From Swiss-Prot:
Pathway: Cofactor biosynthesis; coenzyme A biosynthesis; CoA from (R)-pantothenate: step 5/5. GO terms for molecular function: ATP binding; dephospho-CoA kinase activity. It is found in: Cytoplasm. Its EC number is 2.7.1.24. Catalyzes the phosphorylation of the 3'-hydroxyl group of dephosphocoenzyme A to form coenzyme A. The gene is coaE. It catalyses: 3'-dephospho-CoA + ATP = ADP + CoA + H(+). It is an enzyme of class 2 (transferase). GO terms for cellular component: cytoplasm. This is Dephospho-CoA kinase.
Amino acid sequence: MSNFIVGLTGGIASGKSALAAEFEKLGVPVVDADVVARQVVAPGLILDAITNRFGQGILLPDGTLDRQALRKIVFADPTERRALEAITHPAIRTELQRAAKAANHPYAIVAIPLLAEAGARATYPWLDRILVVDVPVALQHARLMQRDGSTSALAGQMIAAQASRAQRLAIADDVVSNEGNTDQLAQQAQRLDATYRAALQTHRIEN
């Protein structure tokens, strides 16, 4: 059971998944908010609530969620998007905390791409540390164009739609710079792993 939880976040194309993978190599369990978000909308109470709000048109013939149909609705209207978030986000947060605490390791990492946008510790008060993967905006832009084949304009729009680099750094307890190569990222993960294991001792004494 994990009694120490680290929230991992970063902007688009910053290398969140790469850093999470380095922690996993060290045996640290990583709970991914994107995966949990997909699990939460499986057939059940949450999907029933979504269907009641948005209608049967957001279901596929087999009764599962038609993500594309729902996406069209919520992206076209901010009010509808907020209505969806009001249904799904509390369930996602609850499951993230449950899964992290249930992990069979001294500490766990919860990967939350939009942690800054969601309110950081005001929304996730159970996070013991917040770790931000940081890259310059110009590098984010270049990676998006290379990775996804995005146009320069689209890459700029995607970056602008998220919290700013300064806003993410403002919520950080720890920062990993991902301007270098995989070896450098691995070294930073190893350093932080040692830091978190040491912090666990203090955490246990205080609690």
